[in-house]
Amino acid sequence: MSPVVSPDGRYLAFLRVRTVGRVAIFLLPLTSGPAPSGTPRQLTDDDPGVIGVAWTADGRDLVFSSGGHLGLSRTAKISAAPQSSRTPEPEFLTFGEQATAISIAGTGRLVYSAQFRDSALYELALPARPATPVALAAFSSTFDEQTPHYSPDGQRLAFASTRSGTEEIWIANRDGSKPLQVTSMGGPQCSNPQWSPDGSEILFNSRRAGSGDLYLLRPETGKLTRLTDHPASEGEARWSRDGRWIYFGSNRTGRDEVWRMPAAGGPPIQITRNGGAAAIESGDGFLYYSNHTASPSSIWRVPVDGGSEVRIVDGLSYSINFAVGERGLYFVAIGDTADKPSLDFFDVATGQRSTLVRLDKPFWFGMALAPGERSLLLSLVDSAGSNLMLVDRFP
């Protein structure tokens, strides 16, 4: 993707995606036709992934932006000259933080788009009427905070944040104070932390080793255990209520389905047959999940041990933006437009759906229900946008 031909027409530079967050620059020689001449040569590593690329006016170098998934990106310059033995080292530039698209004129003027986004965790006391979500003041980061989860005693939070420059797992007190980074995976994606029912471990997914695998972390000791090692992409994992099983989404069959594996390790068992992800076990023996192929924006239900799949409610904003309570489902719903979401509740026994609160900010990734259903955590976008930046007389 993002093909750009060198000023002299001899090379085509392009980006090749291996998986989310892992993107590298490749160079392909061209004939005067133009037509491919030879095989593409990889010019950069794919971790951190490349976002945008442009040729310098003299055609000797490429300028690009790279960074982890949702994390901090930087601009760099790398030689396009053939290398006899090793990949050239990029030279990081003094400008271009959060750059995406890059363009360089023949006169040497460079322009790029600098994007920004600040998402934060908001807590909503339950019952919600007529309250509104309140930001956790201790979260002072200007980067992303997302996919939150309460500890079993409700006193601590686990969440993903890009405040260190790459997406990592953090823990904090319930009010957001004393945040502590507990992973150092280095990108490109590290997300969806879930406390174990006994509070001793945190389950999460990371793409550090490729397409996506599940990991267990003991935050008190820092011990990290890799649970899955499969070419497929696996994530959005949740514990069973007794802590003996782990439910997760995997595309190992060719599409996303819900699978279950022993928490202590062992072969997984496929649960859904028509698409699924982000499964949560209820107290009455069902799994509630999203991403069914017949209706991806709906929440579905299937017995824990497998059986008939039933659509429960429509309008889910994103696959992990729901929680299962004792009486029903809390979920971030899409309003008339995507920028007008609401927090809704669906009573499973009566089939009644109600809106708890209209959200005045765009939704982001993840939500969590506190023990005892005293409150909900949401990730909402405080600000987002982009600016065009001009660099004169480059390089």
Summary of predicted features, one role per range:
Residues 18-21, 68-71, 116-118, 163-166, ...:
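Short glycine/acidic-enriched loop and turn motifs that connect beta-strands
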Residues 24-26, 74-77, 120-122, 168-170, ...:
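A short loop-to-beta-strand structural motif that recurs across blades of beta-propeller domains
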Residues 20-22, 32-37, 71, 82-87, ...:
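Short, solvent-exposed loop/turn segments that connect beta-strands within catalytic domains
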Residues 30-34, 79-85, 126-129, 173-177, ...:
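Short loop/turn segments that connect beta-strands within beta-propeller blades
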Residues 1-16, 21, 40-65, 92-114, ...:
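Conserved beta-propeller blade repeats
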Residues 121, 366-395:
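Blade-level signature of beta-propeller repeat domains, shared across WD40, Kelch, NHL, RCC1
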Residues 38-41, 87-91, 130-136, 177-181, ...:
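Predominantly a core beta-strand signature of beta-propeller blades
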Residues 76-85, 320, 331, 387-395:
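Predominantly five- to eight-bladed beta-propeller fold
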